Structures are given as C-alpha cells and as structure tokens.
Amino acid sequence: MIEIRTGIGTDVHQLSAGVPMHVAGLSFPDETVGLVGHSDGDVACHAICDALLSATGLGDIGSIFGTADPQWAGAAGVALLGHVVALVTGEGWTIQNVAVQVVGQRPRMAARRAEAEAALAQTVGAPVSVSATTTDHLGFTGRGEGVAAIASALVTRGLKGEDSSLIR
C-alpha cells in the first residue's frame, strides 16, 4: 500500500538584541537582533520539523526536543531538522518536498533565498521552497517583536523501485 501524507508546522520566536539571527539554516551576522529560543530559534527549521512530524504522525517538536533537555540547548536549527529527518526516514517515509514561509519584517530573505533553499534541501534530502513575507507592520511580526514561519511537507511510504521520489 502506498501512503501519501501532508503535514503543516508553525513556529514563532521573539526578537531580542544581543542574540544571533539564524533563519532557514543561515546566519545573518549583520542583524542587530536575533531570535530567542532554547535552541538557536530558527523558526524556519522548527516549522519544517513540525510539518514533517505532523505528516508522519511522529509527534511534534516539543515532544522530541523538550526545553528541559539540555542536549538541545543552543542547538542549530539544521541539527534539529537533521534529527527529525533521520526519525522520519527511519520509519520508512520518503520526504518528497517541503515549503516554508518566513513571516516578519526581518531578516530580509530575498537576496539569500536560493542559499536558504540549498542549505535546507541538503539537510532534508528533498526539494525545499523558501518564501518570505511581511505583515505590512501589523501584529507582533509587523512591530518587529518576533518572526514566524509556516511550513508544509509531503511525504510518502510504500513506493517501490530504485527512486521513490514523486518529484522530478
């Protein structure tokens, strides 16, 4: 039997001065603020983790990387994502593609979108689409208080053959 599933994930982190900015597997050293979190606060990686876990029924980011676990304190978002990818593929799932949208006034993603897609695709092992938007200065993201991300993932299990990818 072939299983095809989708999952959705979201994440939000507060912005604060004196914290490094990491989003979509990239560092933004010129930013004067960064995302506060138990790990590096990478909202894109965290949303993708939740989308993959949701699609496969393996829980959520909080159940895998609880804030009480010191092993993940300060961990890079791509490290968390790599761990989730290993869990997902270890259960026989093939990740077909992922899409993630970063919502906030900063960091500006346009100039580094291709770089972010490449970094995330390398970790995920499947195509990743990255987009970004603002809320036209509305809400907490618009006021510069935080950044959010929304992700979707498509996974399959049970495809036979050398190449189990549906995406060409």
UniProtKB/Swiss-Prot annotation:
InterPro entries on file: MECDP_synthase, MECDP_synthase_CS, MECDP_synthase_sf
Cofactor note: Binds 1 divalent metal cation per subunit.
UniProt GO BP: isopentenyl diphosphate biosynthetic process, methylerythritol 4-phosphate pathway; terpenoid biosynthetic process
Swiss-Prot/TrEMBL catalytic activity: 4-CDP-2-C-methyl-D-erythritol 2-phosphate = 2-C-methyl-D-erythritol 2,4-cyclic diphosphate + CMP
Enzyme Commission code(s) on record: 4.6.1.12
Required co-factors: a divalent metal cation
Binding-site residues for a divalent metal cation, renumbered to this chain: 11, 13, 46
Pathway(s) annotated for this protein in UniProt: Isoprenoid biosynthesis; isopentenyl diphosphate biosynthesis via DXP pathway; isopentenyl diphosphate from 1-deoxy-D-xylulose 5-phosphate: step 4/6
PROSITE patterns: ISPF
MF terms (GO), sorted A to Z: 2-C-methyl-D-erythritol 2,4-cyclodiphosphate synthase activity; metal ion binding
Pfam families tied to this protein: YgbB
Site entry (Transition state stabilizer), positions: 38, 134
PANTHER family linked: 2-C-METHYL-D-ERYTHRITOL 2,4-CYCLODIPHOSPHATE SYNTHASE, CHLOROPLASTIC
Known role: Involved in the biosynthesis of isopentenyl diphosphate (IPP) and dimethylallyl diphosphate (DMAPP), two major building blocks of isoprenoid compounds. Catalyzes the conversion of 4-diphosphocytidyl-2-C-methyl-D-erythritol 2-phosphate (CDP-ME2P) to 2-C-methyl-D-erythritol 2,4-cyclodiphosphate (ME-CPP) with a corresponding release of cytidine 5-monophosphate (CMP).
Xref: NCBIfam families: ispF
Self-association and partners: Homotrimer.
HAMAP family documented for this protein: IspF
Identification of the protein by name: 2-C-methyl-D-erythritol 2,4-cyclodiphosphate synthase
Organism listed in the record: Cutibacterium acnes (strain DSM 16379 / KPA171202) (Propionibacterium acnes)
Organism lineage string: Bacteria, Bacillati, Actinomycetota, Actinomycetes, Propionibacteriales
